[in-house]
């Protein structure tokens, strides 16, 4: 079983159980390219993943991690870097 916890900015959260990670790939083909990444492999090993979707300008951004704490830390870091880049322009 592979459990996916998805967090949408301003839309709430969802949790979905997949019988196998391949079912997840069929419904979310954009993640297939990530399957060999170290963090994604750890998510598969533990049986669940946290995914966050948010808007940056007019683009939807997506990130994932193996724990909610790590996901939030990455989001805070990414937002800080993006703000720094904006300030430099």
From Swiss-Prot:
Superkingdom per UniProt: Viruses
One Pfam family of this chain: DUF3045
Organism: Enterobacteria phage T4
Descriptive protein name: Uncharacterized 10.8 kDa protein in Gp30-rIII intergenic region
């Amino acid at each position: 079983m592979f459990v996916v916890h998805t967090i949408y900015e301003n839309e709430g959260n969802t949790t979905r159980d997949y019988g196998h990670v391949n079912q997840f790939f069929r419904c979310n083909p954009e993640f297939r390219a990530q399957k060999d990444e170290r963090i994604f492999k750890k998510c598969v090993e533990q049986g669940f993943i946290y995914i966050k979707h948010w808007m940056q300008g007019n683009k939807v951004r997506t990130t994932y991690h193996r724990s909610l704490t790590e996901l939030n830390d990455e989001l805070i870091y990414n937002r800080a870097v993006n703000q720094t880049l904006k300030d430099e322009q």
